[in-house]
Amino acid sequence: MLIDAGTGTLFGSAAGKLIRHLEASGYRADQIDAVILTHIHADHSGGLTVDGEPQFPNANIHVADREYRFWIDREGLASLTAEVKKDLQRAHDALAPYIAADKVKRFADNADPLPNFGSILRPGHTPGHSSIVLKTGDGQRLVFWGDVIHGDYVQFDEPDVFVTFDVDGKAVAATRATALAEAADGRYLVAGAHLPFPGIGHVARDSTLYRFVPWNYVE
């Protein structure tokens, strides 16, 4: 299974290498039977479908119901800006073949999308943005943050700083403050889509508020 699906071909040749990296790791896209989306922004869902063809033909796509309704079941499109309409079209294009095949499975706020995987509603970046929790038998956990953080410096010290892609800046600031405090107190691993390599680590308190401590890795 996968958590998020990358950009596909939407953002140029420097991105969209998920399938290639899967193959380099010894896996094929048709072996993936589930993809859980943290949210439906194009850099997280664009890799689901390329040129109308599903890239994970044997996978169910799991997404928060609140997120699905915002992007797919949304009404009042005439009043939206051209940029928002473009984002909505990308969302529809990414999910269309899976919707047609009845392979999109929606989960409620804070519900488990799959066995051993939980979710935490972290709204603001998008209405249904959810962090995904990998539960282990020994009580440890790894929380896939999604877009709680957009870098390893400013927002750790200033959680109220938001980016243009955040749907609700006030909500995302509160979400980020909560997520950082919980990660520091819980001492669990977090994985951030926009954190620098290796992208996995811990949150620690420091003199300026928080800092990211990357997880040690072996080449």
Regions found by a protein language model. Name each.
Residues 52-58:
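Short, conserved loop/helix-junction motifs that constitute active-site signature segments
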